[in-house]
């Protein structure tokens, strides 16, 4: 039941007693008793099967009536909000103030007080109490734990009715009972032993390095601190958003980066979870679906249309497993909150009413926003829908989206009685012009009951109908009620004691009472609660002769109809009987008669779907039994495709049995077992240029297609869904000029023509729809014509060109919020416009940034402006309108380059409002004609390449790295190579944190002074650019021969491995590493003192993320990783060949395969971007330069890849996988960025395939102590040859007190040391090189002292006299043993050996005997402070629970930034991890 109320929140005062009752003569009507209140009563709640009612009043006061509203009393000593337990109707909890609450288990007769340690939470998606479906004493409690202005979510629980309250989970996003509904588990044969104790919680970080939300569970209330993640298909379900309990089903919704499609998982036993498939209608996208009122054998879901600005949905019904949904009805009406016009008739199986938008297609296309609503009813569980009939006219009724009362909209437990407000005609009119209609045969026929709209209720099992005039909106008052004693045929009226407008009319939940409650308001703003009692109208109690055996469902012939194997009957009072049933609290129960089985009693079995004729057809080819189908013409006995619906009790004897096996032909069955061979399919295309794109799949993408599109030179578009085996040519009226994949939704692609016409597909190029822009796309060089919103996939910005001259136009920006159906002007004279708002970041959701030419003149300079209302009223001009060169959005950063005379400056913002000037390294002047290239920001620092030498073909520059908020840059790598297109030889190694490769120019002076050709060396970093080193060369080449230089354990200036980088790559999408083949890197290059020309290169591979290398092929080869690295394919580069080589053991051995009978030149080799497929495409050029031939090469037939690998989380190294840890080559342990990471890798010798993308990250063994590799040089410091950081001569450290100015809440700052911690590092303890000496911020001395408290007399003795006693010896010993230099801190080795090691933080200042004393004394409070920080670390939530009602964790990114871990990290440094959030930002030129 959906509970609604139009009542305004307010306070309530019991007024002085008015006359006790207003009584009519017994024969004239009901007895009415009135209580007056000066504020509107709210939240009326009946305890079921009692006359006890509680309502809310003034300042959360609660009032109680135990005589069906005849009298009221204050609930003494208790106040707050009442939360009824809907599964245990005698139970309710009062959420009280001051952490005191109350619970009752006997309908408010007695109450038990209890306390919860923290403040309870409601709103923002959280409810304070989650009740168990079967045990009233088991309750989950939602709270928030706050300290130091920061809060996090905490869940408590009780199993003994609040006698004890214990903590369950911290930092969760909500917890749920497995048995969240009384029906859950019924009929299931295999249930967990402790199902009643099983609790699920949404957990944001299953491991500290993987911040995607999981659903975890425990049968011991997490008392052992162990959480088991829910799986589907052997993989953790990630990106969990919410969970719900619906009858016998648990439903889980999940999302992932790269698609707007949501995944729905269903379980009937709280153990096994299966993904639900939706057929025949739109996919479930985002959170846009509503689980409707469902049955024990089926789930009803309304899926919102993605296209329409006006809310419209599609109704889906599941099979009995809850995993196969079929669309029953399109165009279902819903409101902006996704409340859906759908309601089942109470107590009768298979009948429900729904309102649909008859002009849905016009509304979706934007032709109109006015919905034409019509009502429909189904009598067969949604198979068919019919109009409602009032005589010979169609009837349309207002539904849930227009509530007028509380409780159900149309019906009640009164058998067959249905009422509604509406009108006859061709569409639904307004509520105010509607009349009141009634049906006494469950909606088959209708009659007009009363003129005008009324609130209505049912009593005495339907023998009494009560209605009151309902015009609250227009404040029209009435002094009478209407009632009917014969199912609405005739109506009588009764006078009310006051002229009022009705606010609420209700009665007992089971509609068996003769007493009703009316909440009303009069013209003087007085409020009344009226008890209306009809008990004395009929003196006679009904006898057997007064009842009929009423069939609940009728077929087309008017005969009792069958559903779920039986007919349904009710014992119901005859309409004209002059008696009352008077069986209070005895709800009518149905009688059933069994039916013989018919086709309707069966549903499609797994792997089968209904067709348009309601027949079950195979969704995929049927697998034959083993040993069958040796020949295509053979036949076998296979599944029929049907199964009896579980719970259906039809009689098979004498009826239909569709479950029997049927004969099937082998040619329609699945393919034969694997052949052991690699298969090849060849397709030629007439085109000179190769232009293709994969539509990548994400974690929650449905289906299994591998879709590729190819555009030819003449504008044709070809699509393959099987990775190049078969292709289809698109049918478009105009040639396609370019395609633009949606940046944030891989399922969506846009095709643009030279004019205004464009096409879009949201189903992975299966179907295309067209629209027109306001102007043809821009021709301005370097300007993209289409921009997308990261969270609203249908929001577009279109850049159209006007007055184009060559490749220069006056560009206008338009926006659409419905995928191009409607366009509105944003700005004229723009450079580019883009959405920069993103959920989980500090920017506003609808924030747009535009660069606009002065005076809208394209010859003028650009300025940066922004707006969060589409530039209708509010426009912010940044940098006082001064010229900018460009701007870019990278992860959470907005980076802007401004031009000030001859100097180029950079600014950074994380909220789109405040820009901080980027402080570049000292003495670093950037001329205005130089270029920035933003390289990467995936580790929450910006890598920026700044050109130092722009001479054509001689470009190079410096790679700078920012702090975590992008405002302070230090030099990471000088002389980094760049080309004339602003691409840089810099590449991050995927998955493994902080590893990157770069090429530097080793003769910069000669290049600058003499114009010499650039010479290169390759460098690698393992700590995110803090340190760079030469690549270690292999010991021998692939033939076992020595190299020309002397190879050592590490790369040297004379002998190292050098690899050709990004600037020489023919296809920018190719990469040296893979996002799924962890640790594998391939490149072409040479061993020597510098990089030789590409033509002289060989091919090399690393299996340990770049620490060691080996040569795999002589000569240059192209490569691709498949099946997450279990297949590696290489093919000769830029020379004719007909052979490829592949490795199944990470490059240890190679096998040649002839893919063509003639030699061709391979232009490119490709596979899906996630590298999870066993299919590849070789894009080849035969003799003709105007033809491309695509060779699909399929490795899935190999015997070595026949079975799927086995990975068990409880024993990850027991079967086909092992655990691998990346490490730093200069460290003895496997610590990288302050932690040990463990990754699942397939054993090279295992003969199996990986299949769906693995959760590669196994977990984190531990956080490590901080070492030199966890720090980099601070601003105005530079690295010395010995690895230390020293202040640049003539400069001062950055102002350490700036943090106090920037953050009014800051209590302290730290004196500069020359070092800053890498933002991505999670190390603890060890060398705290950036936080040595703390000082109080101005006016924060008191708070500082409280944070760093002093010590008492006894402690003071040891803190002063004992250190002084040993200071001389310690200081002298340290001085004599230490060989460091004054004025700098030397970074230590991997682990501190002792407190007096040469790298100890204690020895970090000029040392004298006295300094030894000072250091020891100072260390004590600092050590305490450090320990305290490691135990607090609360995270800041956005806004107030009580104010905004905002859910604190709206997205993965938001939760990544609020992990709830007790780690002392500055807020700006908190969002460090979460590879799932990385959107694959490519280099972006500013």
Curated annotation (Swiss-Prot):
The chain crosses the membrane at residues 1350-1370, 1402-1422. Residues 1-25 form the signal peptide. Residues 1371-1401 are cytoplasmic. This is Vacuolar protein sorting/targeting protein 10. It is a multi-pass membrane protein. Glycans are attached at residues 296, 900, 965. Belongs to the VPS10-related sortilin family. The gene is VPS10. Keywords: Glycoprotein, Golgi apparatus, Membrane, Protein transport, Receptor, Repeat, Signal, Transmembrane, Transmembrane helix, Transport. One of its GO terms (biological process) is Golgi to endosome transport. BNR repeats lie at residues 377-386, 437-447, 483-493, 718-728, 1100-1110, 1142-1151. Functions as a sorting receptor in the Golgi compartment required for the intracellular sorting and delivery of soluble vacuolar proteins, like carboxypeptidase Y (CPY) and proteinase A. Executes multiple rounds of sorting by cycling between the late Golgi and a prevacuolar endosome-like compartment. Gene3D superfamilies: 2.10.70.80, 3.30.60.270, YVTN repeat-like/Quinoprotein amine dehydrogenase. Pfam families: Sortilin-Vps10, Sortilin_C. GO terms for cellular component: cytosol; Golgi apparatus; membrane. Residues 26-1349, 1423-1486 are lumenal. It is found in: Golgi apparatus, trans-Golgi network membrane; Prevacuolar compartment membrane. SMART domains: VPS10.
